[in-house]
Every structure is written in C-alpha cells, then in structure tokens.
C-alpha cells in the first residue's frame, strides 16, 4: 500500500525543557522557508526563547496544576444551594492546529458536603484550560473535577470561545464563536438549580458586566449578587457578610 512514511513520535519528555522548546522553535522557523532578511532579523533573534517561555509559563502550564489540590480544603456545609461564578475569562490551545482560543467560562455546582472559595473555581478553570484541549472537553473536565474532587452533587460548565482555528484559518469567520456545555449529577436534569444557573449565564452574556465575573449563592434563585471571583479566607467571608457559619460565602 503506497503513501508516505510517517516518522514515529519521540517519547514524551519526563519534564518540560525550555531549552529544548527553544531549539525546536528555532528549527520550526528555519523550516518555514522565510526570506533570509526576515529569518536573520533582530526581531527573530530572541524569538525561540520567548516562544518557549510563553508556552511553558502561560499556555500549557496547566499540566503542572492538580485539580484535586486546587479543590482541596473545602469548608463543610449542609447546604445544597447553587454556587456559581460567571464571566471567567480564560485561554486555551487547540490540539489540532496549536492555535489559541479565548473565551468566557461559567461554572456552577450544588454542594455535596463541602464548598470552596470562588477563587478556587477560577483557578480550576485556568488549570484545565491552560492545556492542549478542545472546548467541549474543557467543559466536561471542569464539571467532572467538581464532582470527583469536591464531591459536588451536581456541576456544570458553560463556555463561549473565539477559536483562531475558525477565525484566521479554515472557514475564516471572524464572528464565529464556539459554545460548549457540560452538565453532571443533579444539574444534568432540568430543575430549579439548573434553570437558575442558565438565567445567570444569560444575564452575564447579555449585560454590560460581561466577562467581569459574578459570584452567586442562591436558594431557588432567591439570592444572587455580583462580586469579584476572588477567594476570601473563611473568617473574612463571615465578617464581610456579618453572619456566622461555615457556609457563608
């Protein structure tokens, strides 16, 4: 059977190597067949090092973060009210063309005995997004992490993203946006909590505060409020709200 021979992939390195990544970037630039005055210009002199740093420190640094550790140390609670953070900006890299995507994530869960700070949800999204990942897999990874590592009774993640795979190549549709949703546990079924989260997402996407982030704690949709998705210490959260108890958010 005819066809070109594909060289086997090298085994993955045990640890990231900035020098190896920089060398590979330099070889990639050589392989592009750029005009000599471009390839030898001062603009590209330090590009391999900068590219290696950008990838290892900003684009695929999520592989060094453990979702289980991020969600560890939750506060015990007997409550089952919806907890949500909307408008979480994130970026990821498409594994097909190694082009970035940039989007907004909305995350919610129904506690199964523990709650975590809003900031931990933001860090969870970053840890799972800063990888080579498709949007639909990212949404599922976030929801699954909340169920498996936090013990949430239900979890959901809704994403909207601009993918350069669609906007600068291929179909080249600059206004196209990718949407992905994942629902797990009790939120996989229609009910008050799921509908409340959908309302929060719709409000975030339609309102002037889009992308700024809003935290919500709601019992049957009776209470919600915009706030920064930063993580406050338990004592600070209790003082801020003026109420005691481990479930104060």
Language-model features: locations:
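A domain-level signal for the structural core that forms small-molecule/cofactor-binding pockets
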Residues: 2-213, 217, 223, 227-249
């Amino acid at each position: 059977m005819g066809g070109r021979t594909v060289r086997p992939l090298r085994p993955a390195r045990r640890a990231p190597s900035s020098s190896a990544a920089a060398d590979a970037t330099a070889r990639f630039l050589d392989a592009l067949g750029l005009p000599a005055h471009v390839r030898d210009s001062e603009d590209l002199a330090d590009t391999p090092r900068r590219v290696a740093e950008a990838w290892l420190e900003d684009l695929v640094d999520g592989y060094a973060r453990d979702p289980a550790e991020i969600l560890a140390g939750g506060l015990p609670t007997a409550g089952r009210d919806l907890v949500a953070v909307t408008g979480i900006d994130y970026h990821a890299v498409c594994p097909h063309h190694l082009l970035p995507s940039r989007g907004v994530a909305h995350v919610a869960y129904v506690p199964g005995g523990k709650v975590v700070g809003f900031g931990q949800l933001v860090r969870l999204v970053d840890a799972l997004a800063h990888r080579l990942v498709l949007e639909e897999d990212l949404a599922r990874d976030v929801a699954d992490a909340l169920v498996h590592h936090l013990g949430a009774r239900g979890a959901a993640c809704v994403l909207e993203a601009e993918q350069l795979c669609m906007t600068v190549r291929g179909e080249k549709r600059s206004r196209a946006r990718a949407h992905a949703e994942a629902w797990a546990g009790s939120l996989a079924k229609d009910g008050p909590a799921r509908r409340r989260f959908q309302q929060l997402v719709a409000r975030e996407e339609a309102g002037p505060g889009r992308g700024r982030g809003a935290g919500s704690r709601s019992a049957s949709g009776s209470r919600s409020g915009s706030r920064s998705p930063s993580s406050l210490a338990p004592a600070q959260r209790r003082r801020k709200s003026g109420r005691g108890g481990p479930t104060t958010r």
